[in-house]
Amino acid sequence: MSENLYNDVDPIETRDWVQAIESVIRREGHKRAHFLIEQVLKTAKINRKEFFRSSFTSDYINTISREDEYEYPGNLILEKRIRSAIRWNAIMMVLRASKKNLELGGHLSSFQSSATIYEVCFNHFFQAKNHKDGGDLVYFQGHISPGIYARSFLEGRLSEEQIDNFRQEVDGIGLSSYPHPKLMPNFWQFPTVSMGLGPLCAIYQAKFLKYLHNRELKNTSKQIVYAFLGDGEMDEPESKGAISIAVREKLDNLIFIINCNLQRLDGPVVGNGKIVNELESFFYGAGWKVIKVIWGSRWDCLLKKDTSGKLIQLMNETVDGDYQTFKSKDGAYVRKYFFGKYKETYDLVKDMTDEEIWKLNRGGHDPKKMFNALKKAKETKYKPTVILAHTVKGYGMGVIAEGKNIAHQIKKININGIIHIRDRFNIPVSNDEINKLPYVTFKKNSEEYCYIHSQRKKLGGYIPFRLSSFTGKLILPKLIDFQSLLEEQKKDISTTVAFIRVLNIILKNNSIKHLIVPIIADEARTFGMEGLFRKIGIYSSSGQKYTPQDREQLAYYKEEKKGQILQEGINELGAASSWLAAATSYSTNDFPMILFYIYYSIFGFQRIGDLFWAAGDQQARGFLIGGTSGRTTLNGEGLQHEDGHSHIQSLTIPNCISYDPAFAYEVAVIIQDGLRRMYGPSQENIYYYITTINENYYMPAMPIGVEEGICKGIYKLKTLHGTTSKVQLIGSGAILRSVCEAAEILLKDYSITTDIYSVTSFTELARNGEDCERWNMLHPNEKNKIAYVKQIMNKNPTVAATDYMKLFAEQIRHYIPSQEYHVLGTDGFGRSDSRDKLRDHFEVNAYYIVIAALNLLANINDIKKKVVEDAIMKFNIDANKINPRLS
């Protein structure tokens, strides 16, 4: 900040202005004073437009003054002992794991910087789930997991054997490196690594709690969502990208606590600036309540004595790189290089020893300051709150890591460093014991033991805790309820329309219709879903304060507080985060929701795959509908929109069940089975990805007895009987029609018999094949299991064709009974044109399928190669054209 800002050329005039405002506040109140100040600012802006603007940053001091603080409600002495024991055990856990030389890693410094913050929350704020409400939802910062394990150990929730197996999980008794519900399903609720997903998901989790409450499905009014974040993590676009949504939704049930230890993994976050000020400006500008906790109580007297204002000026001027350096040195260094900058500030500490200067603490390490910030945050109404807590990375670790750039990488500490930590936190471990790296515990009925449990009892129980299954029972629709879709459709429709009809049937089911959550990223009209606007309404926390332009239309844009549709705008990350909050409501709220997020399929896994991977970790249950799928089917939108690979991406997530249906009845069977698996008695921890298309065509009735095949991934659609050779053709989605057309050509022109199979899921077939092979390998003396696809198909030459990359259908090559298997797919970049031209370009139309089948027959000498050559000429195929993968 400029020196000129502090160079008061007329202190008397300044005093007059300040006294005038103080007088207005006393006589007429803050509102009048605020109005007058705003008028002054407006005048200043008019006269100095290019220079003057209101500042979004305040002085580098605490938002809450000492005079406005409440008394601390806890026992500070006992809490310090407990906190010190947790610090120690967290360090011992990592060091003991490191001694095994397994290259396990582990992080020490992040928790040491935030231990006080967490302990204030554990002792006074975190409400556990109880019979009255769902409790608070806490997104713990990923790198501080050892500290949470250490507390759970003192509480008796984790055993010594478990914490001794930190990052050693294969044998089933260890603890995960970071919060992972998949690995610790009764402990962690939310995965918060990779970084950036925690704050994003916390915002939409808070929004979803409001959604449940406003729809009168569940009372969530007392629940708070806490998100603990690092200042370095805030550089992730996801960390800050949705903060305006929290303001728009008035999420006063959301509190961000950002641990501003000024360091990221390699060095300072903003060494040449001030990350706290940067974040304050960003959040304040977005409309958040900002509470800065910069200095601890030991600074209070100095700030009170600072009549010149030079101390606050110095605090404002000092950059983060210097603040970090100060905490890596000692009191004498701080006296000389911080306070020594100005005579006034140097004189402030002239009667203090170097040790007293060194003990001047930062706000995030002061329980009283943190308590008041959290209390103020909980009391804030109609807006979210962010607490910016100034801390020291590696706090208490001394020369080993405190304030050092290497702090994040410290995983081993020599004996002198361990002794320093023991002495720093008064840990009752003798020199004889210290080499054993012992944990410390509290005897049952000791003051500390009783305090830990009594504080948690007051707050309803222990956290983190995760419910792995919902406790109620849902009455789900049976397949017969979708009878209208199992029959031949009177008009040509797309599978997207079939999905909408399935959704409408479910929305008429009185048992579960209130649990349905359609989620859209501003494409409802594209998918033909606008009819739902009036039927179930679009959720809006503010209702609808305007008259919609299309109010007279049947499907007008109807927003309401009890609306069911989550319309997230052009915001795939936000829509997916809402989907994730709803998809885990069965666990977080013991209230299962049945959700369908429909979107352009290419803007799913490709754009937000990290979030869908986290959904797998979080054991999400629900449906993802990849609409307008297929490289050649969304024909006019071109390269960026045409999806030929989302199924390749979805198969990387083990509990994502993927389907590419071709017919309306397949869509109905798949969704009904998904409801049974996810929400029925077995409550499987899976979620579904179903691709649908926007191409209208004839939808036949469901053949008898194909339900099992549809769900497992393949069934025989029909056989066309010829008199010569035999082949098998398999396909999925839009290209199954090309497969059927090719079979007709093979019969008509070559009298070839063709078995046609609809493959609803190449991925599930491949997984089944892999499972069979694994079982057979490990059970050599037992009868081999046979892959499902091998049971269904025969040994005749086989051609597979899909609207996706060849790799999609290549998955099952090893498991089909035929030795001759050729795959056609849409490798390459998409482009705009008619569907016929695109399918010719990507070589997946009926003619290419015929050529592929004839070629396989020629390879086994069933027909002559001349037949293939003639067919290429007959169908006007350019044999020398560039491979579409490269063109």
Swiss-Prot record:
Catalytic activity: N(6)-[(R)-lipoyl]-L-lysyl-[protein] + pyruvate + H(+) = N(6)-[(R)-S(8)-acetyldihydrolipoyl]-L-lysyl-[protein] + CO2
Protein's UniProt keywords contain Translocase: no
Essential cofactor(s): thiamine diphosphate
EC identifiers of the protein: 1.2.4.1
The keyword Flavoprotein appears for this protein: no
One Gene Ontology MF term: pyruvate dehydrogenase (acetyl-transferring) activity
Entries under Pfam families matching the protein: PDH_E1_M, Transketolase_C_1, Transketolase_N
Keyword terms of this UniProt record: Oxidoreductase, Pyruvate, Thiamine pyrophosphate
Complex and partners: Homodimer. Part of the PDH complex, consisting of multiple copies of pyruvate dehydrogenase (E1), dihydrolipoamide acetyltransferase (E2) and lipoamide dehydrogenase (E3).
Function: Component of the pyruvate dehydrogenase (PDH) complex, that catalyzes the overall conversion of pyruvate to acetyl-CoA and CO(2).
Protein name, per record: Pyruvate dehydrogenase E1 component
Originating organism: Buchnera aphidicola subsp. Acyrthosiphon pisum (strain APS) (Acyrthosiphon pisum symbiotic bacterium)
